[in-house]
A protein has these predicted regions:
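Accessory "access/gating" subregions that flank catalytic or transport cores
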Residues: 77, 84-94, 103-113, 122-127, ...
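An N-terminal structural lobe/cap that precedes and organizes the functional/catalytic core
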Residues: 1-35, 54
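Catalytic phosphate/nucleotide-handling subdomain of diverse soluble enzymes
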Residues: 1-17, 128-149, 154-155, 219
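Long, well-ordered alpha/beta core segments of mature domains
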Residues: 1, 5, 11-13, 99, ...
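N-terminal, motif-rich segments that launch catalysis or mediate targeting to/interaction with membranes
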Residues: 1, 66-72, 174-179, 186
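A generic alpha-helix surface/boundary motif
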Residues: 36-37, 138, 215-216
Length: 219
């Protein structure tokens, strides 16, 4: 679903049927090969690998990158080590969605253990992201871990919320989505408009990608 529609419906609903297309080049997708790099760090360095060690292997990668990932690798190549490679003082994309699309591997490696997922996500995600950019990955990693044994989607999201600061913008957004869904469970368009009106604000990403609505696929 992602590649054919990415960035094409910013601020508007894309009505009609979306036909899923098989990817002939799945291995060339950044939300796969970046994860493989960090998984290799766990395999070669060990589960106690530090954020700096994750950054070192990421720095030496040769594949294509964008946004926070690209900014982090440039920083690392210039001698700015992780976690500062993902800090907004050095990476203008620190609030972007990069770690969120890559954090599922952490949850898949920690089935039923969202706290353990959060431990690793906090180390890995700081290579390229910060703040809400980091929290998105922590939340999704924890939800993947919780979903191995929890079948109620609402409870899965609640487990994810426990992984991030309650006062963060990301957590407040998710709580809004849960509350609005409880009010109007059958009207996703109404809830989508609520998200747009409250949360689709200017984002620091210099490319102008408005990421907040994309963070709530369950809305």
């Amino acid at each position: 679903y992602g590649a054919p529609t990415e960035f094409r419906s910013l601020g508007q609903i894309n009505e009609g049927t979306i036909v899923p297309l098989g990817l002939a080049n799945a291995i060339d997708q950044d939300d796969l090969y970046v994860e493989m790099t960090f998984a290799r760090v766990m395999d070669t360095v060990g589960l106690d690998a530090t954020t700096e060690q994750y950054g070192e292997m990421f720095r030496d990668s040769k594949y294509s990158l964008w946004h926070a990932n690209a900014g982090a690798r440039r920083n690392l190549s210039r001698g700015i080590k992780a976690p500062m490679s993902g800090h907004p003082d050095f990476n203008v994309h620190a609030n972007d969605i990069d770690f969120q699309i890559e954090s599922d591997f952490v949850g898949l490696m920690t089935p039923g253990l969202p706290q353990a997922s959060n431990h690793y996500a906090d180390r890995v995600g700081r290579v390229m992201n910060y703040g809400d950019g980091l929290y998105g990955g922590m939340l999704f990693g924890a939800m993947y871990a919780a979903a191995f044994f929890e079948t109620d989607p609402h409870r899965v999201v609640e487990q994810g919320l426990l992984a991030i600061p309650a006062e963060s913008g990301y957590a407040r957004l998710v709580r809004d989505v849960l509350a609005w869904h409880a009010q109007d469970p059958a009207d996703w368009r109404k809830n989508w408009r609520r998200i747009e009106e409250k949360w689709n604000r200017g984002d620091p990403c210099p490319d102008g990608v408005r990421v907040y609505p994309a963070w709530v696929p369950w809305a």
